[in-house]
Structures are given as structure tokens and as C-alpha cells.
Amino acid sequence: MTAPIRIALMGCQGRMGKALLEAIRANEQVTLGTALERPGSTVIGLDVGDLNGLGAMNVLIADDLEKVKDQFDVIIDFTRPEVTLKNLAFAVANNKRIVIGTTGFDDAGKAAINEAAKKIGIVFASNFSVGVNLVFKLLEQAAKVMGDYTDIEIIEGHHRHKVDAPSGTALSMGEVVAKTLGRDLKQCAVYGREGITGERDRNTIGFATIRAGDLVGEHTVMFADIGERVEITHKASSRLTFANGAVRAANWLKDQPCGLFDMQDVLNLK
């Protein structure tokens, strides 16, 4: 029997970190090798299981990957771009695979991820939900059939604490639609409208953002014509849906060579 893959969980006390901890604990194919928080945190040195009401897991929270590099095989990182890029550099230097769920990277950050994928295996996705990745495929079909003659709008909502907008998932949805239609999202995206905007340009893709309460994640892509519209919607009610997908990706990644992958690869949807 193959030994479980050992996970290094970054940001273990964040919202996604806690969901990932639960998902790792429930999955027999993986095990928690180490859990990390930022240097100076008051939780450093505590048992991550005891701290989260799960009982002792014999994993003490660390603050430096270098100190625990022999305790894991794959990193799961849902933190912030600047933190993830630092962890990515560590992964390359130490030949560790990494699953990246962090969003909000600029072009330089994305380029660094692409460069790292020449040396290690990386799963990088804006959304690890199976349902959202099915939506990506549905959007391709809708764009092929309706995209050239409808107005396309993407509306997304998340909790009040989310720091980037639009969400990485919304941008990925826009990329799927734009690519299918042969457009460049950077040129055709419209992020919010205010004042006298003039008539809508049919070739644009609009984005609207909601930040409120404890919304986990809601996305709707609208293809609107005169007299009818099609809306493709995904609503997440628990972060566990993303956490389970990320753990699934980590287990899948163990058998892959170096390269850049996403959840479409993990789910064999390509």
C-alpha cells in the first residue's frame, strides 16, 4: 500500500487553512506533515489539532519551511501573492511540489509561477471546486453558441474580508469566454461602470463585484440578448468544496512530472 502524501499546510489558521486542515484529516490518501503560520504568531509551537478542537495531531505549528523541509512532500498554499512566491522559491530550491490557490497575482507573479513549473510540478488554479471547473466547460459551449451576439456580464460575490477584486475565479471565467471568442480579456474587460458611460460595446465583457457578510463565493455569467438571456451560476456554501479539491490536486500531483497544471487537468476535463 502506498504511503499517504505528506502535506505542508501554509496559513493553517486562516479561513481556508482551517477548511484544508479538515479536508486533509478526512482524506486517507494524504496526511498532514506540517502546518505553518507567519513568524511571530502566538500559535507557533502549538499542536494544530488541539488548537482547532480536533484532538492532538502531533503536528506543531512552525514558522519556517526550512526547519520542517523533511516532513512533507507537497505544499498547499492559499495565502497571499508575496507569501506564495516566497514559498514557491523554496519549493523550487528543494524540489517540492506545490498546489497554489492564492489569487491576485500580477503579471510578474504569474511569470514566476510559469518559470518555476519548468523545474517542479505545480497545480495553480483560481478555484478548486469541481462544480466551478464544470462551469468553465459550460462557458466554452455557451460562448461558442451565443457569445458573438449577446452581452456578456460576470457578477461575483464574496465575503467582506476578501482583498482582491474581481475574484480570480471571475477573471478565469472571463478568460475562458474571451479565449473561446478569440478576444483578449485585457482589451475587452470592463470593471464596473459609473456616470455617463455611453451605450454598451457588444465586444466587451463586464465585471461586477459584491463584497458582503460571509458569502463564501458566488459567480454568475450572463449571456443576454433582446428577449432572452442565459445565466450560468455557481454558488459555494462551504469552503470545504475548495479544500477537498485542493487536497485531491495534491494527491494527483504526486504522480506528475514538472509542469504547470490546473484543476481541468486534475479532473481530466481537457
Curated annotation (Swiss-Prot):
Record CDD domains: DHDPR_N
GO cellular component terms, semicolon-separated: cytosol
Biological process per Gene Ontology, one example term: lysine biosynthetic process via diaminopimelate
Pfam families the record matches: DapB_C, DapB_N
Molecular-function GO terms, alphabetical: 4-hydroxy-tetrahydrodipicolinate reductase; NAD binding; NADP binding; oxidoreductase activity, acting on CH or CH2 groups, NAD or NADP as acceptor
Catalysed reactions listed for this entry: (S)-2,3,4,5-tetrahydrodipicolinate + NAD(+) + H2O = (2S,4S)-4-hydroxy-2,3,4,5-tetrahydrodipicolinate + NADH + H(+); (S)-2,3,4,5-tetrahydrodipicolinate + NADP(+) + H2O = (2S,4S)-4-hydroxy-2,3,4,5-tetrahydrodipicolinate + NADPH + H(+)
Residues that, per the record, bind (S)-2,3,4,5-tetrahydrodipicolinate: H159, G168, T169
Superkingdom to which the source organism belongs: Bacteria
Binding annotation for NADP(+): R38
Keywords: Amino-acid biosynthesis, Cytoplasm, Diaminopimelate biosynthesis, Lysine biosynthesis, NAD, NADP, Oxidoreductase
Entry EC no(s): 1.17.1.8
Subcellular location: Cytoplasm
Residues involved in NAD(+) binding: G11, C12, Q13, G14, R15, M16, E37, G101, T102, T103, A125, S126, N127, F128
Pathway linked to the protein: Amino-acid biosynthesis; L-lysine biosynthesis via DAP pathway; (S)-tetrahydrodipicolinate from L-aspartate: step 4/4
Cited PROSITE patterns: DAPB
Main location: cytoplasm
Residue numbers annotated as active site: H158, K162
InterPro entries (UniProt xref): DapB_C, DapB_N, DapB_N_CS, DHDPR_bac, NAD(P)-bd_dom_sf
PANTHER family membership: 4-HYDROXY-TETRAHYDRODIPICOLINATE REDUCTASE 1, CHLOROPLASTIC-RELATED (PTHR20836:SF0), DIHYDRODIPICOLINATE REDUCTASE (PTHR20836)
Family according to the record: Belongs to the DapB family.
Role of this protein: Catalyzes the conversion of 4-hydroxy-tetrahydrodipicolinate (HTPA) to tetrahydrodipicolinate.
Annotated protein name in UniProt: 4-hydroxy-tetrahydrodipicolinate reductase
